[in-house]
Swiss-Prot record:
Protein name: Glutathione S-transferase D6
Location of the GST C-terminal domain: 86-206
Limits of the GST N-terminal domain: 1-80
EC numbers: 2.5.1.18
Function: Conjugation of reduced glutathione to a wide number of exogenous and endogenous hydrophobic electrophiles. May be involved in detoxification.
Keyword Transmembrane helix: no
GO biological process: glutathione metabolic process; response to toxic substance
GO CC terms of this entry: cytoplasm
Length: 215
């Protein structure tokens, strides 16, 4: 099973932790988006949308992080605990996954990812939208240990990958006490956390080295 990815990206880290949870190993193939490798003909042939991560499982090809993690748990999970078959539980998990994609991850991407290109974060408006996204997550977690229901799910894993991106930058989660509490617990109960943290540290080192060149 091949995973075309960029190691430190939140999307890749979400897939890697999910794979760890279901006991799947990948042949990891790095695609450097900073130099445009995702646009090379060989990769566009695999994924016309030229996005990473992209999973190739025999002749089956799937991309988009949240689609990949759901596929992995449904295809390889030993049970349905990470993505229950109950329609209402599944719907809640889906809602949290869509919230991550359209609001939380989007907020982090628009505020922090410009650092990779310019050495400076996004605008004050971007920061306000990011704080609003964390306020929503903080609300979701009021009185709960997990983001969707009463047990660890793929929604926790994906959102953990997103939130842990703040380890690379100066962002205080203590402003959001429910998120901070959940984040500390999620590190303890999520398979693959240590590997996730190692990838973050490598990405942080890369970021620091490149920031020095840009400043």
């Amino acid at each position: 099973m091949d995973l075309y990815n960029m190691s430190g990206s939140p999307s890749t880290r979400a897939v890697m932790m999910t794979a760890k949870a279901v006991g799947v190993e990948f042949n990891s193939i790095q695609v450097n988006t900073f130099v445009g490798e995702q646009l090379e003909p060989w990769f566009v042939k695999i994924n016309p949308q030229h996005t990473i991560p992209t999973l190739v499982d025999n002749l089956f090809v799937i991309w988009e992080t949240r689609a990949i993690v759901v596929y992995l748990v449904e295809q390889y999970g030993k049970d349905d605990s990470l993505y229950p078959k109950d329609p209402q539980k599944q719907a809640l998990i889906n809602q949290r996954l869509y919230f991550d994609m359209g609001t939380l991850y989007d907020g982090i991407a628009k505020y922090f990812f410009p650092l990779l290109r310019t050495g400076k974060p996004g605008t004050q408006e971007n920061l306000e939208k990011l704080n609003a996204a964390f306020d929503l997550l903080n609300n979701f977690l009021d009185g709960q240990d997990y983001v969707a229901g009463n047990q660890l799910s793929v929604a926790d894993i994906v959102i953990l990958a997103t939130v842990s991106t703040t380890e690379m930058v100066d962002f205080d989660l203590k402003k959001f006490p429910n998120v901070d509490r959940w984040y500390k617990n999620a590190q303890k109960v999520t398979p693959g956390w240590d590997e996730n943290l190692a990838r973050i540290q490598s990405a942080k080192k890369f970021l620091a080295e490149n920031l020095i060149e840009k400043l």
